[in-house]
């Protein structure tokens, strides 16, 4: 029993150190401000980030470059590393933002999340992939933010 308590406290300390280290990473935004589509994406990501923070998530990465792609938001929810794919639309006239995430994109996000976990030696951490859909001009005239936890296969 003492060994289990010791192992648990070591794991807890390591997770706290990870959270602190990830929080201090330098965050860069590679999109040009003259790119209207990029500006729309950034606006949606900011809405998603505010929403997740209100839920108690700790944001540890934004537009994190991994391998040959990027992950929109990386957060910690309790003891789980959460990789968030953010999809933004100005309105819902041409479909829901989630409808733009096909099988290829799902596989790509899952591969990027697995690469991130390997890069940071987090193979033993719980992880999941969430989708945050942002419709900027929702029915109420305000942005509508929808959060889908564990939206598709998490990294192996």
Q: What residue ranges belong to the model's regions?
A:
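Acidic-basic catalytic patches of nuclease active cores, encompassing PD-(D/E)XK
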Residues: 3-5, 10-62
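Conserved catalytic cores of phosphodiester-cleaving nucleases, focusing on short active-site segments
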Residues: 52, 71-93, 109
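Mg2+/Mn2+-dependent nuclease catalytic core
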Residues: 90-116
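Short acidic/glycine-enriched loop/turn segments that link adjacent beta-strands
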Residues: 67-69
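Domain-level recognition of nuclease-like catalytic cores that cleave nucleotide substrates
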Residues: 5-6, 119-156
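Secondary-structure boundary/capping motif
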Residues: 55-63, 82, 89, 146-150
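Short helix-to-loop capping/linker segments positioned immediately adjacent to catalytic or ligand/cofactor-binding
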Residues: 60-61, 117-120
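Solvent-exposed beta-strand sheet faces enriched in polar/charged residues
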Residues: 63, 87, 130-132
């Amino acid at each position: 029993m003492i060994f289990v308590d010791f192992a648990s406290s070591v794991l807890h300390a390591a997770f706290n150190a990870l959270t602190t280290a990830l929080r201090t990473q330098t965050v860069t935004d590679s999109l040009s401000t003259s790119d209207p589509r990029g500006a729309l994406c950034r606006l949606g990501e900011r809405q998603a980030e505010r929403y997740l923070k209100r839920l108690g998530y700790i944001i540890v990465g934004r537009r994190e470059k991994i391998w040959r792609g990027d992950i929109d938001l990386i957060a910690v929810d309790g003891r789980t590393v959460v990789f968030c794919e953010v999809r933004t639309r100005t309105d819902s006239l041409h479909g829901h933002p989630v409808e733009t995430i096909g099988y290829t994109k799902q596989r790509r996000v899952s591969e990027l999340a697995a690469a991130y976990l390997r890069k940071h030696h987090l193979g033993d951490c719980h992880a999941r992939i969430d989708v945050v859909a942002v419709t900027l001009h929702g029915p109420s005239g305000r942005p509508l933010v929808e959060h889908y936890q564990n939206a598709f296969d998490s990294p192996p």
